[in-house]
Amino acid sequence: MSEALSDEALLELAEHIAVRRENDVISTQAVGELTVNATLSGVIGLIEFLRNDPNCRFSTLIDITAVDNPARPARFDVVYHLLSMYQNQRIRVKVQVREDELVPSLIGVFPGANWYEREVFDLFGILFSGHSDLRRILTDYGFRGHPLRKDFPTTGYVEVRWSDIEKRVVYEPVNLVQEYRQFDFLSPWEGAKYVLPGDEKAPEAKK
């Protein structure tokens, strides 16, 4: 494996990608690793180019994840991480998605995207068009909501338990064993008030 690309080489690679895929690339940023902000309609073609282009060769899909920004009209960032073992370099491709938009599936380019897209759907509720098996993968089939959204309550909506009487899993309203506490607030910083060994010498040194 070769050494990682220098910052200058990253800038050259960013320019190469932006020129060759000008209709798909919105902007690039090269700080240690390369980040490409892409259009939703062009993200699949861009990633296919990153895999096949001899100057890129990002042949390994590391991960697909998402970030929730509720205050933004395009609420979600869908983030793709790829690796070029030929250049010892990673790249991050980001695309902004509204809550009512479909993201094209990457399975046709990287079949391993199957489980990553199911995870993003399960945890964020983002839908992928062209995915033949978009089911939950981490939470239960009857789970309500998507737990990595910023508006998902910390207590959840329901709790699950096994009923010996009904001989099945049942869903019930959340029943907290202690009074509910609201943690959504800012606490003022208060420094430590204890005295560590040796601290008593500090006033003496000032005399």
UniProtKB/Swiss-Prot annotation:
This is NADH-quinone oxidoreductase chain 5. Its EC number is 7.1.1.-. NDH-1 is composed of at least 14 different subunits, Nqo1 to Nqo14. The complex has a L-shaped structure, with the hydrophobic arm (subunits Nqo7, Nqo8, Nqo10 to Nqo14) embedded in the inner membrane and the hydrophilic peripheral arm (subunits Nqo1 to Nqo6, Nqo9) protruding into the bacterial cytoplasm. The hydrophilic domain contains all the redox centers. The gene is nqo5. NDH-1 shuttles electrons from NADH, via FMN and iron-sulfur (Fe-S) centers, to quinones in the respiratory chain. The immediate electron acceptor for the enzyme in this species is believed to be ubiquinone. Couples the redox reaction to proton translocation (for every two electrons transferred, four hydrogen ions are translocated across the cytoplasmic membrane), and thus conserves the redox energy in a proton gradient. It comes from the Bacteria. It is a peripheral membrane protein. GO terms for molecular function: NADH dehydrogenase (ubiquinone) activity; NADH:ubiquinone reductase (non-electrogenic) activity; quinone binding. PROSITE patterns: COMPLEX1_30K. Belongs to the complex I 30 kDa subunit family.
